């Protein structure tokens, strides 16, 4: 949620990374089932990028994939299906045509990615002398695992943390996810966000990117501090197959609200890179602009193989991805057999 890194994590982190390894030995981790979608929330637009690098044009919005023109951010309705060619199939069987995004997008550091270009290796960097605010933007902390064999799904639980003590228009994202280690096009993400839709509040939504340069998300749903969130990504194919379609659900078990992307395409990717938990932020200039409780814990993390069975041995890595200019706060990542705790 643009891509914040363009090489395998250890190579990307560099001297600022803090790397911890944990061996996870577990089978039969309980996972949450699919919940029914019950609400009819409004569909607000993502937050304007007020704190973006100076070369990002006015009017662009923040997404978990970087900065996009608002016309290239699409809401997929509750009964709709996002097809592999970018069209949207509606409940009545009709299909909306796919329109490629005609605008460049920008990574969290301000690198420009032209329409039709992949996010790797990172786009055109900002011109010399372009101002970058002294703040944290992009991936901050992550727990991840890569295997040569593809995965069949992942799920994790976490609680909605406290709102930030200081509201400066910043955006916070928390999520597990799946990505293709060798073919970085997108990442499937069930996301909890604060101010993700210009609302200065907590919401959940499920995301996929970037067919035709567009970024797609499900209808966001409001949630509250203390609610139990379940993020679940499941391949929509038979056991033993590498799925081309996926269901992404972000579920509030406390309220019953669910925000789901159904049967969304893999866009030709094979998901062999898993994230137990990630903190991604935009516009953070001080420690009191993070969630005021200072941490998020992802628990009951369950990674599935292509047979849709729980993987009994996972070598999780925990990484701190500190950036130049980030405020000095209580950063840390701790991996336990079934959880990832991220502090800030």
Map each language-model feature to its residues.
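Intrinsic disorder/low-complexity segments
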Residues: 10, 28-29
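N-terminal secretory signal peptides that target proteins for export/translocation
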Residues: 1-11
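Intrinsically disordered, low-complexity cationic segments
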Residues: 2, 29, 49-50
